[in-house]
Amino acid sequence: MKKTPRKVYVVDNGFVTSKAFSLSDNLGRLLENQVFIELVRRGYDVERTMFYYRSRNDKEVDFVLRKGVHIERLVQVCYDMSNPKTEKREVDSIVECAGELKCNNLVIVTNNDKRTIEKDGYQIDVVPISEF
């Protein structure tokens, strides 16, 4: 695995919004932070079981969840995938990382989208944050 820069998360989205200049520009980042908080609540640990990954072609996945030595799940976060270019970028990223990491349990967390996407033999569950 290639070493990547660490991402920084805060435990309270209220802190982020109080310091943000434009809330609309940060909705995706706030959603990603909310997913991070939920994963920590579920027991994932940033030092042992929860990672960020960048592929050989610079595609990224927000969360790689590990159980023991096995990759359990890949989680991508995207506030709004209504733009076809955005959807393509997010789907291509998670599929490429899934291939490199040999993981079939893929999810994209969104603000309110719910569906299943199939690409290159992978099934990706798209779920709203309220159901994550």
Residue spans of the language-model regions?
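Accessory nucleic acid-recognition modules appended to NTPase machines
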Residues: 1-71
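Short, glycine/serine-rich, charged loops/turns that create anion-binding
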Residues: 15, 57, 79-82, 113
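Arginine/glycine-rich "motif VI" loop of SF2 helicases in the C-terminal RecA-like domain
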Residues: 41-45, 93-103
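Active-site ExK catalytic segment of metal-dependent nucleases
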Residues: 71-83
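Active-site-adjacent loop/helix micro-motif of nuclease/hydrolase catalytic cores
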Residues: 82-92
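Short, hydrophobic beta-strand segments that form beta-sheet elements in well-ordered domains
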Residues: 104-110
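Domain-level recognition of nuclease-like catalytic cores that cleave nucleotide substrates
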Residues: 111-132
